[in-house]
């Protein structure tokens, strides 16, 4: 699975997380929703399908259920905030904060030439 800072859509991140967990172990939407504190077993599935929205308030609990902490959790909440922003000013603020966080934590994988240079 890609690093969270490579995502711009929280729905896509949740879906990729679910598919990765499902591929590696016994995991269900019900278990995922339960871990995140939702009573509806399919709520997060509906979020991924665009039928429901994840509130900014519950974004933290979903992030925790996915094992995100620190800047990763903050980035996830910012993706949700950006999606819910009504005004251009709020959207721009969430976008700029998300970009700054991504830039601060983005890792670059060295290519063969760079690796050979630093050997």
Which stretches of residues belong to each language-model region?
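Short, solvent-exposed alpha-helical "recognition" segments
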Residues: 51-56, 82-86
């Amino acid at each position: 699975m890609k690093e969270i800072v490579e995502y711009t859509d929280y729905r896509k991140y949740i879906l990729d997380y679910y598919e990765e967990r499902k591929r590696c172990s016994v995991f269900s939407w019900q278990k995922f929703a339960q871990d995140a504190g939702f009573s509806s077993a399919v709520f997060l599935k509906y979020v991924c399908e665009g039928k429901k929205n994840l509130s900014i308030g519950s974004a933290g609990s979903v992030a925790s259920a996915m094992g995100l902490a620190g800047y990763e959790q903050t980035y996830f909440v910012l993706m949700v905030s950006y999606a819910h922003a009504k005004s251009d000013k709020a959207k721009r603020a969430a976008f700029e904060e998300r970009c700054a966080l991504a830039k601060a934590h983005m890792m670059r994988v060295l290519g063969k030439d760079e690796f050979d240079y630093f050997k």
